[in-house]
Amino acid sequence: MKYLDEYRDQRIARALASEIVQRTTRPWVLMEICGGQTHTIMRYGLDELLPRGIELVHGPGCPVCVTPLETVDKAIELALRPDVILVSYGDMLRVPGSRSDLLRAKAQGADVRIAYSPTEAVKIARSNPDRKVVFLAIGFETTAPANAMAAWQAKREGLTNFSMLVSHVLVPPAIRALMVSQTNRVQGFIAPGHVCTVVGCKDYEGLIRDFRIPIVVGGFEPVDILEAVLMLVRQLEAGEAKLENQYVRSVSYQGNLPAQQIMAEVFEVADQKWRGIGSIPQSGLRLREDYSAYDANRIFDLGELTVDEPAECISAQVLQGLKKPTDCPAFGMRCTPENPLGAPMVSTEGACAAYYHYRRHGVAT
């Protein structure tokens, strides 16, 4: 298939769904990791094409959703300083911190600017030498190379007024954490294709070896996801556990080597806290010592914060595939995209937002 329309072809999608029905002889619980995949499933009703025995649960692959509450609070604290320009991706502005969000901080007079590329933050620093420019650098492996390039560029130019508040997370350690959890029900994973375009597929081999669980790297269109489900069902029904790549048009086994090189130049692997989940060993990236001059935590001596999620929010269970958004008593009533209790309701990749926009069964409106 060469053209996008083919990956949305109803005839092909229904044929794949039919084969899934024919091959499924027992119940299976499958998890799509990426929030973009979740939105495709909800938008096109793909789960409703599957047999009752196939349950799709949603994973922690929404970068905005897993950015720690403490990081949001730190960003707000920095933004409210009169000498600081806080630069962020737009998705982060309405993510609730413990008391406020960046959009409210902006309304209070904070200089918060939206960027579509990390290099825009470097440009802002270059153009405002009398201000301290902090870039909120979040995301999975997908955005890490571009964020690393921003730090590399700032160092090359000798910019002394640029820094980054980093909250980068890695997918394979998150899958490992899910697998060792006593509450885990997942029997097969659809790995996020966009992440794998950067890092390739090789990092998933250890998971298959250690847990004997099938993993299929999948794309983001309806046909991609149904084909990935079919590939998982084939493996599970045959008692196999191997790594397969459905997203061959974009993902290679080795990934993007130059992107990996700039990541390795700027970042190193570290333990990382995930919002609603807790700390996962070796699941994040932090700036290397050679780039510590661009670490906002050090520059502003931010220290460590400890804050709790709203008691009513079940986003932690949603991000681990333990509950669906509609299981939340606040869903669609006390928690909406306009007034979110948790990040999954406000992010464009959040599972709660996907359910709110495409499927609000049983919710009073």
Each predicted region: which residue ranges?
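A conserved active-site cap/scaffold subdomain adjacent to cofactor or substrate pockets
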Residues: 165, 183-252
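Metallocofactor- and cofactor-centric catalytic cores in central/energy metabolism, strongly enriched
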Residues: 1-130, 144, 148, 152-157, ...
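Active-site-adjacent beta-strand anchor residues
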Residues: 115, 136, 218-219
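Flexible, glycine/charged-enriched surface loops at secondary-structure junctions
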Residues: 27-30, 161-162, 238-248, 274, ...
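Secondary-structure boundary elements
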Residues: 127-131, 153-160, 181-184, 213, ...
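Structural motif
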Residues: 85, 132-134, 188
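Internal helical hairpin/lid segments
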Residues: 226-317
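Phosphate/pyrophosphate-binding betaalpha-module
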Residues: 136, 140-203
